[in-house]
């Protein structure tokens, strides 16, 4: 299962993002979690928008990425989900050109998921060193987190 804009509790404009929506997605077995990342006050935050533009966040509020990632870790690998050992895919759609946002994301992901990232073998890091990850057996990623980062604005 996947969850698009998984912190959105309703619409992507004139509505809210919250951790309850995220935990509900995980409790229902979603293992591909999609997030829109923005720069708000120089901080990396999760929001949602109906637009692909970098300069438009449609939700009334936003959530610090640290809180979001901590919530993911607390639920995704616990007995509160039907599939805690399945690989977890975190898809980050970064809607910012602010380099500090990327640094904050890397720091927060590293500190939150340090023992769960699929990095034990360096072939999975840095765009997989040109290796096709889809050719790898899924069992190689049991209990691991795979980060997918997209910063394209269409």
Question: What residues fall within each predicted segment?
Answer:
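Catalytic cores of phosphodiester-bond hydrolases, prominently lipid phosphodiesterases
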Residues: 1-154
């Amino acid at each position: 299962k996947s969850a698009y804009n998984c912190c959105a509790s309703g619409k992507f404009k004139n509505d809210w993002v919250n951790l309850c929506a995220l935990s509900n997605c995980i409790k229902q077995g979603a293992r591909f979690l999609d997030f829109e990342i923005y720069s708000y006050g120089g901080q990396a935050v999760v929001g949602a928008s109906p637009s692909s533009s970098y300069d438009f966040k449609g939700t009334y509020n936003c959530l610090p990425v640290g809180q979001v990632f901590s919530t993911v870790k607390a639920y995704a690998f616990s007995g509160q989900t039907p599939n805690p050992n399945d690989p977890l895919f975190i898809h980050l759609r970064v809607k910012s050109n602010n380099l500090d946002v990327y640094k904050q994301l890397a720091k927060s992901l590293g500190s939150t998921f340090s023992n769960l990232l699929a990095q034990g073998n360096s072939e999975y890091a840095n765009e997989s060193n040109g290796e096709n990850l889809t050719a790898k057996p899924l069992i190689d990623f049991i209990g691991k987190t795979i980060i997918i980062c997209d910063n394209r604005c269409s």
